[in-house]
């Protein structure tokens, strides 16, 4: 039709993982992106035009939020702030909040034990992690614009925009792997090291696994809904006087949740998950 014009564009970006995790044997830091854009221009009449634009983008891969971490272990600070330290090195548990939480959760035999040894890798393409990161993001934007010539000298422009964004990311927060067993507060009584089946994450993004060493994960969940509307009246008189008047409305709702969870935090959350719960129940 002479009074209707449309355009459609599509893109995709795919790449294999560039970093290898020897713990799981998997590669990560890949890319899997897809996007599209559709627009429609409709000449309703000689004085009225309508434009519709819709765009969407989705990413679903294993890209990290941060690539690597460096740390020079320090029993007070966790990581010595004066030195960069080694790559793929976790903080000393004795100077980290994870150590305190683990102590409260009875993971240590009396005093807090550093649960992370020396750096496991000195290569950027090889990192030892309990789990690879996950990245999922979906965003959509719809824009509607109506232009109408009220007269030869006055034009009205009305716009409305609606957009949403869902973002979910998980990371191995400590950036390394612990190989130190969780001796537990019951070690002096001859009880075996702690091992528990624990669930990490949120209602939007979670997993469960058997934990027999310390580990720290972080979870980011963001959901956004945005609405915008505006109307403008613009004059184009021949004389010295012209005007521009309008009204703008904006509404945004965002739920942003960030969690950091360790073996200790999950055991504190439910003592029934601790192997010591059966011991206490049997007393």
Q: Each predicted region: which residue ranges?
A:
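Short, solvent-exposed loop/turn elements at domain surfaces
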Residues: 121, 126, 166-169, 241
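Beta-sheet-rich non-transmembrane sensory/scaffold domains
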Residues: 128-131, 139
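Transmembrane beta-barrel wall of Gram-negative outer-membrane proteins
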Residues: 1-109, 141-142, 224, 228, ...
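Face-selective signature of the C-terminal outer-membrane beta-barrel domain
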Residues: 138-166, 213-283
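Generic N-terminal amphipathic/basic segments
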Residues: 66, 134-137
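Short acidic-aromatic active-site loops that bind/stabilize oxyanions
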Residues: 12, 132-133, 217-220
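Solvent-exposed loop segments that connect transmembrane elements
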Residues: 19-27, 64-128, 174-219, 259-283
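Short catalytic/ligand-binding loop motif for oxyanion handling, primarily in non-cytosolic enzymes
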Residues: 59-62, 168, 254-255
């Amino acid at each position: 039709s002479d009074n209707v014009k449309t355009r459609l564009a599509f893109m995709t970006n795919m790449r294999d993982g560039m970093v290898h995790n020897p713990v799981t044997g998997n590669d990560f830091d890949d890319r899997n992106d897809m996007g599209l854009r559709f627009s429609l221009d409709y000449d309703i009449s000689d004085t009225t035009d309508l434009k519709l634009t819709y765009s969407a983008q989705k990413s679903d891969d294993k890209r990290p939020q941060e690539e690597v971490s460096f740390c020079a272990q320090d029993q007070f600070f966790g990581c010595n702030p004066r030195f960069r330290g080694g790559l793929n090195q976790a903080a000393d548990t004795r100077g980290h909040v994870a150590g305190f939480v683990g102590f409260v959760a009875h993971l240590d035999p009396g005093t807090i034990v550093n649960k992370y040894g020396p750096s496991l890798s000195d290569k950027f393409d090889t990192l030892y992690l309990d789990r690879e990161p996950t990245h999922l993001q979906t965003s959509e934007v719809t824009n509607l614009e109506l232009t109408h010539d009220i007269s030869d000298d006055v034009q009205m422009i009305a716009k409305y925009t609606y957009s949403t964004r869902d973002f979910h990311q998980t990371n191995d927060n400590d950036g390394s792997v612990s190989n130190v067993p969780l001796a537990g507060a019951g070690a002096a009584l001859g009880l075996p090291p702690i091992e528990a089946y624990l669930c990490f994450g949120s209602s939007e993004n979670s997993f469960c696994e058997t934990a027999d060493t310390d580990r720290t994960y972080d979870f980011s969940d963001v959901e956004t809904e945005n609405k915008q509307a505006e109307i403008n009246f613009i004059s184009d008189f021949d004389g010295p006087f012209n005007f521009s008047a309008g009204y703008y409305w904006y509404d945004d709702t965002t739920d942003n949740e960030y969690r950091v969870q360790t073996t200790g935090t999950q055991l504190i959350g439910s003592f029934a998950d601790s192997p010591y719960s059966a011991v206490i129940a049997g007393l």
